[in-house]
Amino acid sequence: MVGIGILALTFADLAQRKDADSVLLGLWVLGTFCFAAFFNWSITARTFLPMAPAVAILLVRRFDLSKSSRANAVWLPLLPAAVVSLLIAVADYQLANTAREASRQFHARFQTERGTVWLEGQWGFHYYAQQWGAKPLDLQHAVPASGDIIIVPFNNTNLIALPREKVVSLETAELRLFPFITTFTKGTGAGFYSSVWGPLPFAITSVPNERYYVVRVK
């Protein structure tokens, strides 16, 4: 609905003002929309962010057209929107920080291991864990040896199904997230970074903990 509203706002500005600024703003919004919806490999909220300045300008231009004596009232909805935006930012920060914290905990836990520590997935955890020597699991180029550790982040991508008869479970680590808002948690419909996780830029719901499964190769 927000997307429809933005497009309607753009076309309304073009129809009413018919000036160079309207054309520029229209191309800005429509160009970003076409790229994000039709050319990017995945529909994500962040690919729509480049149109944010243009949308803000369109909103201000729309407010200027209002001649109502209560014109200031149009700004009141921005206050709760600002609060929600800040809460979303905090939730997203906490989600990102769990990757760094999980990496720190696993480093302390397995730094004395004689075998190799392998990790699945991508994104932040992949980056932080590699800094202390964990290796990405790629069965086409390397096979874990007996006694090696494999860490599997649940809320992640490109996970490899491990044969149960070849590994033994050691532990499941959980890290708490922001309690009722998330931008990218599997099963909540929130897919800010990729629509593969869901169609929503964020979700207000009960947010499960980030989980990391740890197994040892038999």
Ranges and model annotations:
Residues 39-41, 65, 69-206:
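Catalytic lumenal/periplasmic loop and adjoining terminal transmembrane helix
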Residues 1-17, 37-38, 84-94:
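Transmembrane-lumen/periplasm boundary regions of multi-pass, lipid-linked membrane glycan transferases
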Residues 29-31, 120, 209-212:
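Sequence-level motif detector for i,i+2 pairs with an aromatic at +2
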Residues 14-28, 73-74:
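Membrane-interfacial loop-to-transmembrane alpha-helix junctions, especially the N-terminal start
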Residues 1-9, 22-26, 30-67:
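Hydrophobic/aromatic-rich transmembrane helices and adjacent perimembrane loops
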Residues 200, 210-217:
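C-terminal functional modules
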